[in-house]
Structures are given as structure tokens and as C-alpha cells.
Amino acid sequence: MPLRARSRKPGAGPAARAPQAGVSEPSFVAKSEDRLFKHLFEDYQRWVRPVEHLNDTIKIKFGLAISQLVDVDEKNQLMTTNVWLKQEWIHVKLRWNPEDYAGITSIRVPSDSIWIPDIVLYDNADGRFEGTSTKTVVKYDGTIAWTPPVNYKSSCTIDVTFFPFDLQNCSMKFGSWTYDGSQVDIILEDYEVDKRDFFDNGEWEIVTATGSKGNRTDGCCWYPFVTYSFIIRRLPLFYTLFLIIPCIGLSFLTVLVFYLPSNEAEKISLCTSVLVSLTVFLLVIEEIIPSSSKVIPLIGEYLVFTMIFVTLSIVITVFAINIHHRSSSTHNAMAPWVRKIFLHKLPKLLCMRSHVDRYFAQKEEKGNMSGSESSRNTLEAALDSIRYITRHVMKENEVREVVEDWKFIAQVLDRMFLWAFLLVSIIGSLVLFIPVIHKWASIIVPVHIGSTNT
């Protein structure tokens, strides 16, 4: 009986077995990497500075990349940032020949397993001086690249003079905590802070961020450090809409108090309401800015000035209302100089309608009424009655004219302080904004021109 040919199973031929021949290659690479780690870290001491000679200096290329400006706490004078510390140095004890280890040119090693420079942020405010324990990239020639992400809270002296149109200069100072310059030297990699992955902040904008290297001498040793200066500008739109404009509006609202008639009781109510509103705004600013007696923000000075302004308007309004309700029965006769100034001179200067002074109007001359012995008694009685009525009417006219004169003086006072307070409000507002415009022109414009030229 002829042997029946066995059916060949799918995938059982040489072509199907070919991929299995390459299965050993990844295993070989893995074994080579394992062998490389054993070779590098056998008897390795991560606390020993990796140099061939004791006097050799390890040069650290240092750079900074910022990913986010998280917050600027003006009250506590802190700047919170998310940064990446770019560090690179040569480790003479971590070198190998790639040909001996399946062509491996780089490996990833945890940072807490090898020697790393103890570069910290000197002006740290939360006690966290070290970076995050992330892996380092070790190349075959001994070059180590380590870029740990760090969340820093650094101290920043806040200058609130031009709040909310202020620019702050916050610095971050990095250096070795234990090594001097002869052991570990820091080389500034980039003059500019890397902002390619920067996430914009809704309140602050980074104008410039530059680095510089310096040295601090302490006795026989010198200590290198790198300082990064961040010039940040506050975006003032929010505070302009909800703080500056209402404050200016309240100051000009005070001017309208003098436009109300003097007999209106709402004048005092309006002044008091404005004063309370300004007090609330002042408390809001006090919650934002740091408690310092060195610098007072311009907006704070403007609010205090406006509060004094409103207080004076209340005093003047009370005085004007008192004058408005004066009469000959409650006060003495008006002094001649008061009449001359407030009834004749000031109305012309204030473009007011001339007030006709009738108080000293020449009285009609009394007619000579020669008594006739032959006049009747009834005629004399009638004349006496007419004289009495005339005197009574003239007296009432005089009293009414005195009251009208005092009312007109109150109107003159209101008009005079209306123009005076309006002028002072405009000048105060200009004094607030002119220094801000000058400050921005001296800083923002050169930076913008420089960035355009580059």
C-alpha cells in the first residue's frame, strides 16, 4: 500500500520558520543591555564625584525651560512656576564601546542611582530645593542629560507702585549647594529662557526672561551661580474694567453733587454713598497688594485722594445747605464784602446769570403829605392803614430778598466748587495715568522694537 504523503501544516515551512530566527535578536539586545548595566554599576558609588583626578572640575551645562507661570502672589510676594531644569555633564565612569554591547548608544538610568549635581534654587520659598527624581539619559561617551520638571515657589519682591499697570522683575538663582567652583562649575547654556512649550497665563505676561552667570566669593573659595530674571507684565484689562473705571466714575460722580439744587436732601446721601463705595474699593486693593509701608500704589493714592475729595464735598454741601436756609430772622445781616464777592464778582467769573440785588434798592421817596387841618378823620385813618400795609409789605419784601440772596450765594458756592472739583478730578486722573504711560513706554516699546529687529 503506497504511503500517503503527509499534508504539510500551514506555517510549517522554512519561510514560516524564518521569523523565529530573529526572535533571539531582541533577547540578545536585552541581554547586552543587562550586561552593560552590570558592567557600569558594578562597585559603583553614586556619592563619589565622577572625576579621574581629585582636582578635576565637572562642568555642568545649565539651562531653563518654563512651561507655565502658575501664579504671582502679590500678598505673600511669591512666584509659582513650572520649569524644566536642563542639565548636562560628562560622567567619566559611565562610558562604554557600543560595539561590545549590540550597538547600544544610550540608556535610561534613574537619577537617584547615579551621581547628580546638587544644583538648587537658592531663593526658594516652600522648602523644596531639589528637583524631581526622573530618569537621566546616559550616552556611551559619558554625556548625561537630565531634565527634571520642577514646581517652584520662589521669592519675588513685588513693586505695586503702578498697580494694576505694573511690571515685576522676579529672579530665580540656581547654584550648587555644597560644591565650590573648583569642583563643580556651571556653564550657562542659553541666554534666553526656553519658552517653546510655555502655556500662557491669564493675568501675567512674560516680557523678557534672560539668564546670567555670576560668582560669589566666600573666603578661599568661589561659588558659581546662574540667575534668571523674569520681567513680567500684568494684563490690566480685568482691573481696568472692574476697579479703575468705577473709581474714576465715582470721583466724577462727586462733582455732580454740586450740580444738584441746594435744597435737595439727596446731596448728602449721594456723597455718603460715594464715600462708602470708595471705602469698599480701598479694602479690595488692600486684600491684593502686600502690606508694606515702602511703596503705596498710585491707585491707592488716588482712592485716598478721592475719599478726601468726597469728605470735603460733604463738608461744603453741609455749609451750602446751611447758607441756603438762612434768613434775616436767623442770622445777622450779610456783610458788605460777602455781598460784593458772591453777588457781583463771582457770578460773572462763573458764567452765571446776574443777580439783581434789591435789598439796598432805593426806596421810593415818601410824598410830602402835608396835613391839612381841614382833613377828615376818616381820610387820616385810611392813610394810616395804607402806611401800615405799605410798611408790612416792604418788610416782607426785604425778608424775601434776603432769603433769595442767601440762596443765590449757596448756588454760587455750588457752581464754584463744581468747577474746582471737576478740575481737580481731571488733574488727579492725569497724574495717575501719565507715570504709567511713561513707564510702559520706557520698557515695553524698546522690548517690542528689539524683538521686531531680531
UniProtKB/Swiss-Prot annotation:
Residues 30-240, 438-454 are extracellular. This is Neuronal acetylcholine receptor subunit alpha-5. It catalyses: Ca(2+)(in) = Ca(2+)(out); K(+)(in) = K(+)(out); Na(+)(in) = Na(+)(out). Glycans are attached at N55, N169, N215. Residues 1-29 form the signal peptide. GO terms for biological process: acetylcholine receptor signaling pathway; membrane depolarization; monoatomic ion transmembrane transport; neuromuscular synaptic transmission; response to nicotine; synaptic transmission, cholinergic. GO terms for molecular function: acetylcholine-gated monoatomic cation-selective channel activity; transmembrane signaling receptor activity. It comes from Gallus gallus (Chicken). The lineage of its organism: Eukaryota, Metazoa, Chordata, Craniata, Vertebrata.
